[in-house]
């Protein structure tokens, strides 16, 4: 699943070519994503100039003077440029075509769990956006905040930091990596972790996410950035996808467990 670094990489890849362009048409070949793409989307957006892009958690906002296109990449989505008139493949569901017509913005989603929604309201007040927690790379995400939110919570720390109401964008890959870097077992209860260790975890989440963004995200299967290229952070992964392999610190075999139907990999020697 594309997580925050992949979404940020996508935004940075498409923004320079999008801003200032006017939409000529929207070709919707498959409207059945996580939520149905409404037939009105094309008429609402045609002729509109894109003013800027922004991100909230894993949602990309493509803004015009009239409203905002909200895009979520779901489990397997990608948003990238192709030369105009490039024939679509089976999983290429939507094309955004521009007046100058040299390139199109294409949305591809094999599993169709993503979303493309239009709103004329402030997108921060949209039902999908307004309840989200702070951005992990912002000053609002800090040790004081996390300690207060964790107090008394009897849920595993990995599950806790993956809750988008606590902090946005920390998905399975980067939760595994940040907890390893912080030396915290993923099954330790959030409410039992000291403020000092939570401060270390906050620092590690920020470091891991920033490094992943710098590498263009992590490509495990489907993801490509806005330039159509894969992310290269996979080569930096210390625990995710490395069950039973040697720990990069102590060389002991890494252990895999299941948490909330997701794979969790950690070192029983280096994480406590």
Curated annotation (Swiss-Prot):
Q: Which GO terms describe its molecular function?
A: 8-oxo-7,8-dihydroguanine DNA N-glycosylase activity; class I DNA-(apurinic or apyrimidinic site) endonuclease activity; damaged DNA binding; zinc ion binding
Q: Does the keyword Metal-binding apply?
A: yes
Keywords for the protein's UniProt record, in alphabetical order:
DNA damage, DNA repair, DNA-binding, Glycosidase, Hydrolase, Lyase, Metal-binding, Multifunctional enzyme, Zinc, Zinc-finger
- Tell me yes or no: is Transcription among this UniProt entry's keywords: no
Q: Which InterPro entries match?
A: DNA_glyclase/AP_lyase_DNA-bd, DNA_glyclase_Znf_dom_DNA_BS, Formamido-pyr_DNA_Glyclase, FPG_cat, MutM-like_N-ter, Ribosomal_uS13-like_H2TH, Znf_DNA_glyclase/AP_lyase, Znf_FPG/IleRS
Cofactor(s) this protein requires: Zn(2+)
One GO biological process this protein is involved in is:
base-excision repair
Q: Active-site residues?
A: 2 (schiff-base intermediate with dna), 3 (proton donor), 58 (proton donor), 262 (proton donor)
Q: Where are the zinc fingers (FPG-type)?
A: 238-272
Q: What exactly does this protein do? A: Involved in base excision repair of DNA damaged by oxidation or by mutagenic agents. Acts as a DNA glycosylase that recognizes and removes damaged bases. Has a preference for oxidized purines, such as 7,8-dihydro-8-oxoguanine (8-oxoG). Has AP (apurinic/apyrimidinic) lyase activity and introduces nicks in the DNA strand. Cleaves the DNA backbone by beta-delta elimination to generate a single-strand break at the site of the removed base with both 3'- and 5'-phosphates.
Family note? Belongs to the FPG family.
* Quaternary structure and partners: Monomer.
What protein name applies here? Answer: Formamidopyrimidine-DNA glycosylase
Q: Which species is listed as the source?
A: Marinomonas sp. (strain MWYL1)
Q: What is the lineage of its organism?
A: Bacteria, Pseudomonadati, Pseudomonadota, Gammaproteobacteria, Oceanospirillales
């Amino acid at each position: 699943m594309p997580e925050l670094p992949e979404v940020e990489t996508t935004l940075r890849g498409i923004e320079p070519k999008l801003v200032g362009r006017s939409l000529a048409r929207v070709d919707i070949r498959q409207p059945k994503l996580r939520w149905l793409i409404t037939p009105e989307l094309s008429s609402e957006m045609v002729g509109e100039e894109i003013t800027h892009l922004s991100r909230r958690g894993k949602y990309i906002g493509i803004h015009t003077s009239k409203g905002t296109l909200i895009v979520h990449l779901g489990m397997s989505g990608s948003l990238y440029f192709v030369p105009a008139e490039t024939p679509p493949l089976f999983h290429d569901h939507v094309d955004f075509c521009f007046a100058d017509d040299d390139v199109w913005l294409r949305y591809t989603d094999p599993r169709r769990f993503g979303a493309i929604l239009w709103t004329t309201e402030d997108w921060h007040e949209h039902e999908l956006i307004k309840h989200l927690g702070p951005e992990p790379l912002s000053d609002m995400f800090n040790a004081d905040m996390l300690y207060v939110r964790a107090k008394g919570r009897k849920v595993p720390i990995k599950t806790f930091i993956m809750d988008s109401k606590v902090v946005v964008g920390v998905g399975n890959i980067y939760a595994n990596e940040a907890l390893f870097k912080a030396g915290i077992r993923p099954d330790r209860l959030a409410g039992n972790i000291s403020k000092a260790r939570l401060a270390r975890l906050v620092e590690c989440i920020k470091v891991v996410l920033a490094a992943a963004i710098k590498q263009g995200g992590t490509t495990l299967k489907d993801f490509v950035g806005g330039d159509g290229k894969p992310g290269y952070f996979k080569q930096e992964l210390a625990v995710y996808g490395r069950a039973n392999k040697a720990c990069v610190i102590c060389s002991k075999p890494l252990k895999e467990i299941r948490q909330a139907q997701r794979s969790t990999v950690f070192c029983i020697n280096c994480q406590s």
